[in-house]
From Swiss-Prot:
Listed GO MF terms: urocanate hydratase activity
Protein origin, superkingdom: Bacteria
Protein location: Cytoplasm
Family: Belongs to the urocanase family.
PROSITE patterns referenced in this protein's UniProt entry, alphabetically: UROCANASE
Active site: C406
Presence of the UniProt keyword Cytoplasm in the record: yes
This protein's name: Urocanate hydratase
Keyword Isomerase: no
Originating organism: Herpetosiphon aurantiacus (strain ATCC 23779 / DSM 785 / 114-95)
Gene3D superfamilies from the UniProt entry: Urocanase like domains, Urocanase superfamily
Database matches in InterPro entries: Urocanase (IPR055351), Urocanase-like (IPR023637), Urocanase_C (IPR035401), Urocanase_central_sf (IPR038364), Urocanase_CS (IPR023636), Urocanase_N (IPR035400), Urocanase_Rossmann-like (IPR035085), Urocanase_sf (IPR036190)
Keywords associated with the record: Cytoplasm, Histidine metabolism, Lyase, NAD
Biological processes per GO annotation: L-histidine catabolic process to glutamate and formamide; L-histidine catabolic process to glutamate and formate
Length: 552
């Protein structure tokens, strides 16, 4: 580790590589480690417990050198954060292919993974950490916002005004929760064990206020609910303790969820009954004992959430495998409340809708402002998109390179890609735009406790789909393509793929963008057609998605 090293992406239109494709990969890799973006940049950790951008600093430097030397007809191969080869390919091939954290299934356990990681043979890539397209907490914000909006529509007449949400976790992902709640006019109480993380969300305006006691927190929550005021309150504490205490006191939140780093019982979740400092010491001294405490705390955490559900609260799992750990530890009712995808998001997935994100390689916020306006002109009828973009412009603070996210579906993403490429070509924006997405998408994940939970045909654990997604994106000319294991829910529980593509204003990019931004969301439609979802079948027929065994 280099203790004082600071990495920031270059800005402007001057290249340090041989082409914009390589430059985009370089800048987004560096952006992942920007101190304003990454949770622990000195240890190369971007977000999500131990999700890293490169295996170590030596590997990081070698990746940077490789990208700077890479020709337009070559492809760099990265194996779990380490550059291992450069091969001649062709101009339309990806400039980088990445595989992170992949293990043969029988060996896909945290214990085996950590042993291999300690030996310097692998790293945990999470989703967008090791695939170089993390844009800070905004990256998950709209998904969280849309989930809560769906809850408001289904249960509370379309608004969260006068309703409050109990949740936990203010890390890189969970940090989106307080702002997503207040953007839906609700009140949030978010429990966080790490004061530093809570302060970071205050600094970036995702969180309104922070307190140290449950009494202070509930006074603020009760006042805001009574007055119909949107407010987010951070409470320094341990979720397993606070959730149970609130239930014992007879407090009944309207909504309950959680986004602690429960996917990793050792490096992520902090057990109850000890301070953060004590937990960190135990983690180093006796990892096995730590995991026992952590797992026991997760069981209590889930028991409290089940109790809230039994008492009438709207309770859902936010995809961190908290239920999975509790179930494995012997708590039979762990899955008594649903995951957020089957409960609220799957209808969007059936349309090929998912998190479409883009970043201005220039570093100029004005470029994002121009793309915002152009996108709103492109989709004048999409009121949800207009509402989101306007809210994001007002409320979201950029981290690192200016970026935006919005959820677009099959057909829409290709139109947006063509639009952005034209903006670059016409000089409306000052440098190329990089387009990517989370691995949490409609057709790029196999994750039975999250994205593919409770599939209609029972295909939750089928792992072919993310591999097909990665392969079609690679042959269609994505700028870099990644295949990962264990993101979101932890080692052994998921396979997922990512893609990033550069709009550099060229005619060649027009063709690549059209191909990739059609097939990528198209895989989401196909995957849900195959599972028997009527909504997906209707989309496929209406938009002429060619599926050999579907009667058109």
């Amino acid at each position: 580790m280099t203790s004082s090293r600071i990495v920031r992406a270059p800005r402007g239109s001057e290249l340090s590589c041989k082409g914009w494709a390589q430059e985009a990969a370089l800048r987004m890799l560096m952006n992942n480690l920007d101190p304003d973006v990454a949770e622990d940049p000195q240890n190369l950790i971007v977000y999500g417990g131990t999700g890293k951008a490169a295996r170590n600093w030596q590997c990081f430097d070698a990746i940077v050198r490789s990208l700077q030397e890479l020709n337009d007809d070559e492809t760099l191969l990265v194996q779990s954060g380490k550059p291992v080869a450069v091969f001649r390919s062709h101009r339309d091939a990806p400039r980088v292919l990445i595989a992170n954290s992949m293990l043969v299934p029988h060996w896909a356990t945290w214990e085996n993974f950590r042993e291999l990681e300690q030996a310097g043979l692998t790293m945990y890539g999470q989703m967008t950490a090791g695939s170089w397209i993390y844009i800070g907490t905004q990256g998950i914000l709209q998904g969280t916002y849309e989930t809560l909006a769906a809850i408001a529509r289904q249960h509370f007449g379309g608004s969260l005004r006068g309703r409050w949400t109990l949740t936990a976790g203010l890390g890189g992902m969970g940090g989106a929760q307080p702002l997503a709640v207040t953007m839906n006019d609700g009140v949030a109480l978010v429990v966080e064990v790490d004061r530093q993380r809570m302060q970071r969300r205050l600094d970036t305006r995702y969180l309104d206020v922070a307190v140290d006691t449950l009494e202070e927190a509930m006074t603020l929550v009760d006042e805001a609910v009574r007055d119909g005021k949107a407010l987010s309150v951070g409470l320094l504490g341990n979720a397993a303790e606070v959730f149970g205490e609130l239930y014992k006191r007879g407090v009944r939140p309207d909504i309950v969820t959680d986004q602690t780093s429960a996917h990793d019982p050792l490096e992520g979740y902090v057990p109850a009954g000890m301070s953060l400092e004590q937990a960190l010491e135990l983690r180093q001294r006796d990892p096995e004992e730590y995991v026992k405490h952590s797992t026991a705390s997760m069981v209590e955490h889930v028991k409290a959430m089940v109790a809230f559900a039994d008492a009438g609260s709207i309770v859902f799992d936010y995809g961190n495998n908290l239920r999975g750990v509790a179930k494995a530890a012997g708590y039979d009712r762990a899955f008594a409340y649903p995951g957020f995808v089957p409960a609220y998001i799957r209808p969007l997935f059936c349309e090929g809708k998912g998190p479409f994100r883009w970043a201005a390689l220039s570093g100029d916020p004005a470029d994002i402002a121009k793309t915002d306006e152009a996108l709103l002109e492109l989709f004048p009828e999409d009121q949800a998109l207009h509402r989101w973009i306007r809210a994001a412009q007002e409320r979201v603070q950029f981290q690192g390179l200016p970026a935006r996210i919005c959820w677009l579906g099959y057909g829409e993403r290709a139109k947006a890609g063509a639009l952005f490429n034209k903006l670059v070509r016409d000089g409306v924006v000052s440098a190329p735009i990089v387009i990517g997405r989370d691995h949490l998408d409609c057709g790029s994940v196999a994750s039975p406790n999250r994205e593919t939970e409770a599939m209609r045909d029972g295909s939750d654990a089928i792992g072919d789909w993310p591999i097909l997604n990665a392969m079609i994106n690679a042959v269609n000319g994505a700028t870099w393509v990644s295949v990962h294991h264990g993101g979101g829910v932890g080692i052994g529980y998921s396979l997922h793929a990512g893609m990033v593509i550069v709009a550099d204003g060229t005619a060649e990019a027009d063709h690549r963008l059209e191909r990739v931004l059609t097939s990528d969301p198209g895989m989401g439609v196909v995957r849900h057609v195959d599972a028997g979802y009527d909504e997906a079948i209707a989309v496929a027929q209406e938009r002429n998605v060619h599926i050999p065994m579907l009667k058109q």
